[in-house]
Amino acid sequence: MKKVLLVLAIALMAIPALAQSDSYTRGRGFFIRPELYGGLFMNVGYQISPYVQLSVGPGCLLFINQSGSHISVDFSAMAHGGVRVYTSDNPWAGMIDYHAGVFKNGKYLAQRHSLVGGASYKDLDFGGGLQIYFGPNAEVLAYGALVTVGYNIRFYKH
């Protein structure tokens, strides 16, 4: 795990130097971002600067459960929100993302928190990180790795 975090840290420092462009900017304005993020999510948000975007949206979490030799797949609807920060306004940029959400787990509401580091090329964001699920009384239900791929559809000139 330490090696993965080291690679992500090096990538975040190196990516802004890979490409410089005066013709591309992330700009400011509204966007939607369909995304695979431990499930399927639709983010609706606002790019408040070329470096920061806020988003909220519905999603469908995917759970893969293993008990002995039995594997089951479950889905759960979820509402979430978060912030994504870019390291530059170039076509290539490093990206850090934090999202938190609520979903129904059996009879009670549970929370999901995720922290992702990665890269962005123009409107395509991709990365990996960690997620953790909490139940009632802050009981840890599960945790693990997370991979994300999303595409920003922007409703403003950039």
Predicted regions and their residues:
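Short glycine/proline- and aromatic-enriched beta-strand/turn motifs that initiate or cap beta-hairpins
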Residues: 19-63, 68, 148-150, 154-158
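Residues that define the transmembrane beta-barrel architecture of outer-membrane proteins
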Residues: 28-30, 36-40, 62, 71-79, ...
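Sec-dependent N-terminal signal peptides
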Residues: 4-15
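Repeated loop/turn-to-beta-strand initiation elements of outer-membrane beta-barrel proteins
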Residues: 51-56, 89-94, 123-128, 155-158
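A short local loop/turn or secondary-structure capping micro-motif enriched for an aromatic residue
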Residues: 63-65, 134-137
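Residues on the lipid-exposed face of transmembrane beta-strands in outer-membrane beta-barrel proteins
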Residues: 40-46, 58-60, 77-85, 98, ...
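Positively charged n-region of N-terminal signal peptides that target proteins for export
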Residues: 1-4, 19-20
